[in-house]
Curated annotation (Swiss-Prot):
The gene is rplS. The lineage of its organism: Bacteria, Pseudomonadati, Spirochaetota, Spirochaetia, Spirochaetales. This is Large ribosomal subunit protein bL19. InterPro entries: Ribosomal_bL19, Ribosomal_bL19_CS, Ribosomal_bL19_sf, Translation_prot_SH3-like_sf. This protein is located at the 30S-50S ribosomal subunit interface and may play a role in the structure and function of the aminoacyl-tRNA binding site. One of its GO terms (molecular function) is structural constituent of ribosome.
Length: 121
């Protein structure tokens, strides 16, 4: 078990992203197609975290052409270039799966958090 923790510590990124559930973020990540490499962004609300050590992931949801799209990103992946926090959300739940049942403007509506606590992930 100690060997696993040592390997995880070596593979973690040094910089920690500072975001939380309910925040509206823009994730910029690399897409590799053959020999071509390009950057693409995905903007939405973080609706959950899965805490599994180095395999920690977060789920981002957005509405595209009236259809909900969700994407899972590993926090410590080398594919992720950066995560920009566009808006801090004020929520009282750890998982926002209830957002899946909302339609229209309510599907992306979360109150804004004014006092910011820094949470490292």
């Amino acid at each position: 078990m100690d060997l696993i923790r040592k390997i995880e510590a070596q593979n973690k990124k040094s910089e920690a992203f500072v975001f939380n559930v309910g925040d509206t973020v823009r994730v910029i990540y690399k897409i590799i197609e053959g020999s071509n490499e390009r950057l693409q962004s995905f903007e939405g609300i973080i609706i959950s975290f899965q805490n599994k050590g180095i395999g920690k992931t977060f789920l981002v949801r957005k509405i595209s052409s009236g259809i909900g799209v969700e994407k899972i990103f590993p926090v410590y992946s080398p594919i992720i270039e950066k995560v920009e926090v566009l808006r801090r959300g004020k929520v009282r739940r750890a998982k926002l799966y209830y957002m899946r049942n909302r339609i229209g403007k309510a599907a992306m509506k979360i109150k804004e958090r004014l006092n910011i606590k820094k949470v490292k992930h």
